[in-house]
């Protein structure tokens, strides 16, 4: 056996699982953060927390012979990181509160398991190998159906007193909250209402494509969203004083169109 092959055999390998509202993405990751295997399955969120736990058990059963160093789970919802358990979740996944991933995996397979909120995981990834690398203080925001946040201090997630720090989507703003006014989902609602068309006629991608062609209503909706994002990010900066703010989520596929607008709104 070649030394390189022997090194790979001896390398620590982890089962990595990301639980999203639509898909569960999973695979094997090395101790050097190299993705060795990548797969996915449908979440079927409507079936609830117990069904998702069964999917996780199935994934660990499938991969445990190839990667037995540990199981890492990234998930939506608020996570008690000591217990590895969901203690708050939006209605998207019924009966998700109380889902005990860590206890179940460790008792059943004897493999160490850690569970963390998905936005916090995104923030850690940005610190380890992305836009926040080397920063002393950073904020990660994901902008999608809602708005999630993560504070990183010297590369460590700041969880707060009860593991619910930086839930910025619920931040009060203009008689509403940050994510109701500033998340990407607001775009389709506004454009459809202003054009008096069904919401299903519009997607975020469609809105940005029309905005680039000069559509006034699409540009107005984007500008209003950007204004809200600017105010929210500025408020967070007043409190945290970060060295860098990293934006993620599906909407940032439009970075070339949005970056200058958002930076100007924050200023």
Stretch-by-stretch model annotation:
Residues 18, 72-76, 140-146, 150:
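Short beta-strand segments
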Residues 30, 75, 153-154:
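A cytosolic small-molecule/anion-sensing beta-strand core signal
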Residues 2-70, 80-85, 105-113, 125-137, ...:
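ATP-binding/phosphotransfer module of carbohydrate and carboxylate kinases, centering on a glycine-rich
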Residues 24-28, 147-152:
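Short beta-strand scaffold segments in enzyme catalytic cores
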């Amino acid at each position: 056996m070649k030394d390189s092959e022997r090194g790979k055999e001896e390398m620590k390998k982890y089962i990595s699982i990301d639980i999203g509202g639509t898909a569960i993405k999973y695979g094997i990751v090395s101790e050097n953060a190299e993705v060795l295997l990548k797969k996915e399955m449908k979440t079927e969120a409507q079936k609830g927390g117990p069904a998702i736990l069964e999917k996780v058990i199935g994934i660990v059963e499938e991969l445990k012979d190839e990667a037995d160093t540990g199981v890492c789970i990234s998930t939506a919802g608020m996570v008690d990181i000591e217990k590895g358990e969901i203690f708050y979740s939006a209605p998207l996944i019924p009966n998700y509160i109380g889902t005990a991933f860590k206890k179940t995996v460790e008792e059943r397979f004897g493999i160490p398991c850690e569970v963390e909120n998905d936005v916090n995981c995104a923030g850690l990834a940005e610190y380890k190998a992305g836009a926040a690398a080397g920063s002393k203080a950073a904020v990660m925001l994901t902008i999608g159906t809602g708005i999630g946040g993560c504070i990183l201090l010297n590369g460590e997630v700041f969880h707060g007193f009860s593991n619910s720090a930086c839930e910025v989507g619920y931040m009060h703003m203009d008689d509403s909250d940050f994510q109701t006014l500033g998340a990407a989902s607001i775009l389709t609602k506004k454009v459809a209402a202003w054009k008096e068309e069904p919401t299903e006629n519009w997607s975020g991608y469609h809105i940005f494509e029309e905005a680039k062609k000069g559509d006034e209503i699409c540009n107005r909706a984007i500008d209003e969203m950007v204004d809200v994002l600017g105010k929210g990010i500025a408020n967070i900066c007043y409190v945290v004083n970060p060295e860098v703010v990293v934006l993620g989520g599906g909407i940032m596929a439009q970075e070339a169109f949005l970056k200058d607008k958002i930076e100007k709104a924050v200023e």
